[in-house]
UniProtKB/Swiss-Prot annotation:
Protein name: ATP synthase subunit alpha
Species assigned in the record: Anaplasma marginale (strain Florida)
Coiled-coil region(s): none
Protein's UniProt keywords contain Repeat: no
PROSITE patterns: ATPASE_ALPHA_BETA
Function summary: Produces ATP from ADP in the presence of a proton gradient across the membrane. The alpha chain is a regulatory subunit.
Amino acid sequence: MSIVSSGDILKILKERIEGFDSPVKTSSVGDVVAIKDGIALVYGLSGVKFGETVAFSSGVRGVVAGLERDTCSVVVFGEDREIREGDSVQCTGELMTVPAGLSVLGRVVNPLGSPVDGGNAIVADSRLPVEAKAPGIMARQPVCEPLQTGIKTVDMLIPIGRGQRELVIGDRKTGKTAIALDTIINQKKTNDTADAKNRMYCIYVAIGQKNSSIARVVHKLKETGAMDYTIVVAAGASDPVSIQYLAPYAACAMGEFFRDNGMHCLIVYDDLSKHAVAYRQMSLLLRRPPGREAYPGDVFYIHSRLLERAAKLSDDLGGGSLTALPIIETQAGDVSAYIPTNVISITDGQIFLESELFHKGFRPAINVGLSVSRVGSAAQVKSVKKVAGSMKLTLAQYRELEDFARFGSDLDPSSQAMLEKGRRFMELLKQGQYSPLSVEEQVAVVLAGADDCVNGIPVSEISKFERGLLERLRAEHGGLMSSLSADIADDIKGKLLEVIRGFAASF
């Protein structure tokens, strides 16, 4: 009987183990040490990366937001009441992704990409990472195509181009969301006749809004037929702060699908003030040191890295665009606060809405003097440029003269005439909600004011005159109107002024 030594046994075992080729998948597993206010402290996840998605044994997911020597802090995306101390946590080795593509259009989803409209599950064309690097310098081209909002004041004086970041800023209840919704609704005119590549797809992101407000927005988009080309990403006020924080990044990833495939997308962030508050709350729970107004030191970076993803790509990369309309809410018109100044410095201009104008009945309540578009004028249509050239000067002179008149100063006849012209111009710029105008209609209306065609009409009758003029032009001068969409030749301008003066004389 032969004796087998321990060395032989070890050699045989080693050969057997080395010859064992069954695939084995290893993953890092840890345990929940503590869970509070949507933040889980996890021990034992060796090799986990910052920003990596982890899965709890209850099925809830989270993302790693802080790393220590033996533990990591995980932001929970969902209800933390389902998580208990001692639950196992597993690394996934993946980053956070959301569904993207044409199949998501017309749906209301949460920031995780799950439908919340009661419809069927979304079968996505692709899944894209929530956090993505913004396009570099050479990947971009200057803004060169206009994005029509349908709002006279914006399209004429503060034009927006495809790929621009234009801030909408103002106090609560001054019509910020109304401007964004009108812009989305106005895209229907273009989208009904354009092919898939030239359509303007839209994404509306509700951050920390009341569920009733989100429902009202969705209802209006459906009612106007705009939901067909729109995605609504909803993170309500009752959702965890982690979900509210994730919302704009998830929506931006959905918009990047269109941008990177040579298409065009408009994204509305409503609003980034609440997003900053959600991030502040999350950072304090993660025990990060607070700074000014208790915001963490990187609050500027969370918005800059988001808004830099909006761009007009070069033709080599398909020429697609992602246009951003971030909304910021101010307190008592204070634009010098921390978050407003941050976002103003990041964006390419701002549309400033004023409570005083709103309460006077001037709507949209846009303060033209404080509003600016730094890059959009390069994309303005030629016909619009020609008629809108003198508008800013006229309105600035009117504001100055109005201040003099308010103090009872006597004005000479020319100043009095300028004041009367300015009043009629301001009245012409008024516009009802959900009633966007085409470029041709805007050119006709502004031309009527610029060439003194409305001087003899009482200020109280200007709105009625505008409605009647547009009805006459649509019904009897369709050919003349269609020629205004690109440029306005002198003979066309003469014919249009003849029609306007004739209507004004018979009004």
